[in-house]
Design a protein with these regions (language model features):
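Juxtamembrane/disordered regions of integral membrane proteins
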Residues: 1-143
Length: 143
C-alpha cells in the first residue's frame, strides 16, 4: 500500500478541514433545527457545556482518525466512495451503538435520547464518508 506523496498531501489538505467543517455544520444544523439533545436528559448530574476548544480538538481528532481509516480502506482496492462510506460506518459503530450500550448500561441512563443521538451520528458519519470520497477524487488519490 503505497501512495503518491503529493496526492496524499493534497488529500489530507482537502479532507481534514472539510471533515471538521462538516462536523461543525452538522452540529450547528442540529442546534438551529432544535434537534440537538437536551444535556439534562442525557445525564443525572448538572451538565456544563464543553469549552469550544475541546469540541474543536475532538472534531480534529475524529477527522484524523476518519482519514487514516479511509486510507486503510481505500488501500485495499475498490471504489473511493465505497471506502468512504465503509470508513464512516465503521467509525460510527464505535461512536454510535457501542458507546450507547456502554454509557446506558454503566450509568443506568434512559436509552431513548442516546439512541436518537446514535442515529444522528450515523447520518453525520455517512456524510463524512462521502466527504472523504470526494476529497480523494479531488486529490486524484491512487492506492
Amino acid at each position: 500500500m503505497r501512495y503518491d506523496l503529493r496526492a496524499l498531501r493534497r488529500f489530507l489538505i482537502f479532507a481534514l478541514p472539510l471533515l471538521v467543517l462538516t462536523m461543525g455544520l452538522f452540529h450547528s444544523a442540529l442546534e438551529v433545527l432544535r434537534l440537538a439533545p437536551d444535556p439534562a436528559v442525557l445525564s443525572r448530574s448538572t451538565v456544563a457545556a464543553l469549552p469550544g476548544w475541546v469540541v474543536l480538538a475532538t472534531w480534529i481528532l475524529e477527522a484524523v482518525g476518519l482519514a487514516a481509516l479511509y486510507l486503510l480502506m481505500v488501500g485495499r482496492g475498490g471504489s473511493r466512495w465505497t471506502a468512504g462510506l465503509l470508513a464512516g460506518w465503521i467509525a460510527w459503530v464505535f461512536r454510535g451503538p457501542l458507546l450507547v450500550v456502554t454509557v446506558v448500561g454503566l450509568a443506568g441512563l434512559p436509552p431513548r435520547p442516546w439512541w436518537g443521538m446514535a442515529f444522528s451520528w450515523w447520518i453525520l458519519y455517512t456524510l463524512c464518508g462521502l466527504v472523504l470520497g470526494a476529497a480523494a477524487s479531488a486529490a486524484r488519490l491512487q492506492a
